């Protein structure tokens, strides 16, 4: 047994060396630096930060490089590193209407206080390969408009709330749970649901959000507002007793305006779904908002008609680190289990053969 263990250990070490060599690739090609990943593969970095649960572009870039571009593996690496970090303080609640806007659009109102800002997007490209990028030419810098954007842009939902078109959502003062410290239970609070959706796999949430548009829990959404920009993060240390600004982060927020409800007390009003992610992960924020609203079906006495409305199904299968780990464990030796099933199958075949002989 000792020889087998040592032999396996050497094989694993060699496999890791081969993987590192494969990651490096052709030595005649310049090695990809973490700064290049962080600056030029920003959307991949944003996804890894969001689902990994750490806002650190450099660490996310390192994880992507170490994982050879496998984003799920990179998310796993970042999650593992996160568990080693001390918890120094809790930040104060972010006021996203104070965001320094980079992009802001609405599909429900053309004219907004503060205006709409198209910002950087692939939305209107023709999805044709740009072969000039193969020439390694320098991309010209985009022109900048000197016109200053408003420092504070009110949310579309805040305007709808003032008009009585949407219900006001207020903080009840309760301490939000922390899913990284407490195992989630079902039914979950909305705070716990949103935390799990943020860390959930983008592809999984995108598919669920798409399913709600195809009749599996239809809730008729409109993109009320999508905004991307920089926001200051503050903490209030007990020893100081006042707020201090510790930096700023890039966020994308999405609020979906959903079909109105008449089931609750008061006048009919629109409902909302909410998504908030690190960086410019706009598609993830939209999918998160769609699924968030779908999971509110019990709150509005709506019939559960699709998988996106099944809270336990959605939340217990959204985490790609957990899912990848369970699927990947099938690669580990299952010799004893298989031998047991093989012996059972042989006995069953023998019984069938005996019956046929009779």
Feature locations, PLM:
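Short, amphipathic alpha-helical interaction segments embedded in low-complexity terminal/linker regions
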Residues: 1-228, 242-244, 354-358
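Acidic, serine/proline-rich low-complexity intrinsically disordered regions
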Residues: 143-358
